């Protein structure tokens, strides 16, 4: 009996050691976040082990784990019709909310899920629940795009998928089929989905027939640039779950089918050092010393290497492509974008990407709402139901829905 108690105590101590990580005191539901992070870290470690044994790509394994625990079939409710179909060969899940009695045509949101361009699905419970609630509360049609993921495809194929599906949906006969008002269609996404939504919005500005098709864009803690991994938020939250800095950099490398040997050099900005001429012209477009307010900059210092590794952008030129990093787009492109909502979280490496994009859009004359949550962390908006229900998740979702309701 005594030996069993000792063994149990030892096991509990090991579990506590694995689960516990220091977190900012202001973050929402810290112990719940630790448990969520430990679960995700465990899945990542299993996936990396399987990868190292040569059995499967780590992202395929990790996504299999994620989807196995949460995939939902298309199931309608009394107020929301849910169907799986495809738009021009791209899988989508469509959520049809009830029309308002005085409005025969409904508004619509094209939604793009997050997951580092490699994980998750429009069909997992988190996004199914989000889009169902959005369709019901906004009396809207939500088109959630099931774009192809890394390592099945790499940049820019994810962008091509969301553009193809959205262009198909915007055809008059398709909008008519779903009883959607063509003047009330927006695009939205979270994290990597926010990146794709921003890229889609910018790509539409190049095509005259698509230029004014979107009424708004709503970007939820979007990832918007791959040039500077030492913004104040990257420095402040480098080890904060559920998106530590090294994980975000690896997602970028995976997206571009790059070499993992470059990750450590990229973390210290060796890929955009002063001797990398191609990066020089773009650096001013994300100069956080001028784009961020002093309350965000605090005492953080820019990390700009004099001599870096020019091989990185030579082998991964996509790092400097505005289609991948919407924050570095030219002013003329930004000027043509619609009304924008950007949600950012204090405890998120991507916080400053969103704040800088809001500033650049404002400077270009775009109507922007920046919605910042001091106790938020990356990914929080989809965590609204037990056992991963966070108070900040519910508040961010409600704030997002409210803005859409008032502006779409």
Curated annotation (Swiss-Prot):
Listed GO CC annotations: endoplasmic reticulum; membrane; plasma membrane
Chain span(s) of sequence motif Involved in the stabilization of the negatively charged intermediate by the formation of the oxyanion hole: 113-115
Enzyme Commission code: 3.1.1.-, 3.1.1.71
Glycan attachment points: 270, 367, 389
Topological domain ranges for the Cytoplasmic compartment: 1-4
Alphabetical list of Pfam families matching this protein: Abhydrolase_3
Compartment annotation: Cell membrane; Microsome
Record topology, Lumenal segments: 26-408
GO terms under biological process: ether lipid metabolic process; lipid catabolic process; xenobiotic metabolic process
UniProt keyword terms in alphabetical order: Cell membrane, Endoplasmic reticulum, Glycoprotein, Hydrolase, Lipid degradation, Lipid metabolism, Membrane, Microsome, Signal-anchor, Transmembrane, Transmembrane helix
Family: Belongs to the 'GDXG' lipolytic enzyme family.
Function: Hydrolyzes 2-acetyl monoalkylglycerol ether (1-O-alkyl-2-acetyl-sn-glycerol), the penultimate precursor of the pathway for de novo synthesis of platelet-activating factor. May be responsible for the hydrolysis of cholesterol esters (such as cholesteryl (9Z-octadecenoate)) in macrophages. Also involved in organ detoxification by hydrolyzing exogenous organophosphorus compounds.
Protein's UniProt name: Neutral cholesterol ester hydrolase 1
Native source organism of the sequence: Rattus norvegicus (Rat)
